[in-house]
Amino acid sequence: MDANRMNRRQFIKVSGATAAAAAAGVEGILAARRAPAYAQGVTLNMVRWADFVPASDKLLREELLPKAEKALKATIKLETINANDIQSKITAAIEGNSGPDIIMTQHNWQHLYEKGVVEVGDVAEKIAKAQGGFYKQSRDVATSGGKFIAVPWSVVGLMIAYRKSWLAEEGATKFPTTWEEYRAVGKKLKAKGRPIGQTMGHTFGDAPAFSYPYLWSWGGAEVDTKGKVVLNSKETLESVKFMTAFWKDAHDEGGLAWDDSNNNRAFLSGSICATLNGASIYIESLRKPDQYKTDKGEQMKTDILHATLPKGPKGQFAYHVPFSHMVMKYGKNQKLAKDLLLWLGTKENFEPWFLSQKGFSVGPTTEWEKHPIWKDDPIMLPYKD
């Protein structure tokens, strides 16, 4: 028999395996050792935020997505935009019934667009099962009525980045543990032209990640456990009174107009002493050590530490930002979109991206707590927990 020909039995066996792969997605692909037969020329469009760790977007474009294209036999186009523009893009796409197949979200945004997305529990549960389960926060924001309306992707930790030498000069050899202590040291530093620089503008990340824990630490809340609006309370009023004075005493008052990049630039330029942020400030100082210097000419990276938000009268709180991906209902390639998210979420494919983040993002599952990366740099350890 001609070695280049196959008989009917061989053809049925191979074609059957390929069909099973198409039905079973990534797991089927691995089992059949060939990609599913998606229509020739299929293109998948994906929108994500422009990452604060540029190396991660580069990795996606140049390495991970090209590998996914080969595995899935499809073209994948990635668009990265300012996270503040994502929600308007989602709204326009749903109203026009056309747009990206996959869109990244933050917080609980997907609940606003639930009627316009596909249920993705088949993908999410496979990732969770293989990696120790999702964090409660990641699962909660991605589900509605017990169903996954988005696939959890990551969690960006928020800590206060601060100039350890500047605080030490004012007697704070450890970061303040209460709002009163933070206000006192901040007031001294502002008098020297080194204010706290807190983002408080209408923006997606740092401002809400500061404001909510601050409010909670005073006993305030937007809603109670039954969903009743309870913002108008004595505790909320007390938090506002303190913050008004704290802002004038210790902050760069221009922060009311800052977005999530203004405080990064202010810190790295030596204009502020502290700010709530992801680890992107420190990571950028590592990336360009000779560009970012202290007033003494030393590399900025040597003078940065991270701390949790101070505690208030009702305790200490934190909010870390969960990221997810939605598969859009108007999309014509929903199965392929799910296969891509499963491919990206599997441990062997997610790990290179996780490493490129250098601790800026952690995985949505408990698996990544055990990763050796946390032994690489003690300055990043606060983001592990």
Predicted regions and their residues:
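N-terminal secretory signal peptides and thylakoid transit peptides that target proteins
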Residues: 2-19
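Extracytoplasmic "Venus flytrap"
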Residues: 43-61, 81, 156, 205
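Extracytoplasmic "Venus flytrap"/periplasmic binding protein-like
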Residues: 66-134, 143, 165-177, 264-266, ...
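Hinge/lid segment of periplasmic solute-binding proteins
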Residues: 106-159, 183, 210, 299-308, ...
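C-terminal lobe and pocket-closing loops
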Residues: 108, 280-300, 313-385
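Short, solvent-exposed loop/beta-turn-alpha elements that line the ligand-binding surface or hinge
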Residues: 121-134, 202, 218-240, 287-302, ...
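Extracytoplasmic/periplasmic solute-binding protein
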Residues: 145-153, 158, 183-229, 235, ...
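Glycine-centered hinge/linker elements that transmit conformational signals in sensory
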Residues: 185-189, 227-257, 305, 309
